[in-house]
């Protein structure tokens, strides 16, 4: 099941681990940016990712790609369709889309989440694990996970889309370091920015100044339900605040 994702994109997770894309079912084994690899460019150009591309070319069955496989079997659109349609004419690997989760820092404790994506869950996940509840893949190794934000040596000349996630990305100031790199390299105006946020806060002035520099921004307001049910689903959720911030995004000048 060939997919062009490994030729055009990479995702760096909260703990420095990497995946070809957000649909990939698991993390690539024994890969950590800042530990086994200096930066994402070193991994992107390295033998491990080249081997992964060859497996794609050979149409091997890759366990982590099960989501797109199931979508295809059921006649549904998939991320693979997105990559293959958008980048059908590419010839050489280059980082054209980048997905970054720099930490698990979050101000919500949602019932569908875990400590890997929200440090608010760490104490509970740890306690449940100690009581014998299997939290494999959910309990983070420590309360605060951080992923490197150093873009030195990373070739971003072909970048057209940057996705930032969390945790809650709008409370992670290190994303501003990424924006500054794009500005200094004079490419920020060529890049579309995608933000997935719980919409509990609105960006401050410093954030706004950077946001206006991007070619386009897409804001995904993450919500499970509204009103009292929303507050039950997501500890920290405030319907009134959500509505106010939604209006501010609608009127945000770009």
Write out the residue ranges for each language-model feature:
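Core AdoMet radical
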Residues: 95-105, 116-146, 157-173, 185-203, ...
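C-type cytochrome heme c attachment motif
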Residues: 66-67, 108-112
């Amino acid at each position: 099941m060939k997919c062009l994702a490994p030729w055009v994109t990479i995702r760096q997770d909260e703990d420095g681990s990497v995946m070809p894309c957000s649909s990939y079912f698991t993390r690539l084994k024994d890969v950590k940016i800042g530990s086994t690899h200096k930066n994402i460019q070193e991994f992107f150009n390295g033998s491990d990712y080249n081997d992964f591309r060859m497996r794609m070319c050979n149409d091997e069955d890759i366990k982590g790609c099960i989501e797109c496989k199931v979508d295809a079997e059921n006649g549904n659109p998939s991320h693979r369709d997105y990559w293959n349609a958008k980048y059908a004419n590419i010839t050489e690997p280059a980082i054209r889309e980048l997905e970054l989760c720099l930490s698990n820092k979050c101000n919500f404790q949602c019932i569908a989440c875990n400590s890997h994506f929200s440090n608010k869950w760490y104490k509970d996940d740890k306690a449940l694990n100690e009581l014998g509840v299997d939290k494999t893949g959910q309990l983070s190794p420590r309360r605060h996970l951080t992923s490197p934000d150093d873009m030195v040596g990373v070739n971003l000349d072909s970048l057209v889309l940057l996705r930032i996630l969390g945790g809650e990305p709008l409370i992670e100031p290190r994303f501003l370091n990424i924006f500054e790199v794009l500005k200094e390299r004079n490419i920020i105006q060529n890049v579309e920015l995608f933000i997935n946020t719980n919409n509990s806060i609105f960006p401050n002035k410093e954030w706004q100044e950077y946001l206006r520099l991007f070619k386009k921004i897409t804001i995904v307001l993450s919500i499970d339900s509204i009103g009292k049910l929303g507050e039950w689903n997501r500890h920290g959720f405030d319907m009134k605040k959500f509505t106010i911030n939604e209006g501010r995004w609608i009127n945000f000048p770009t």
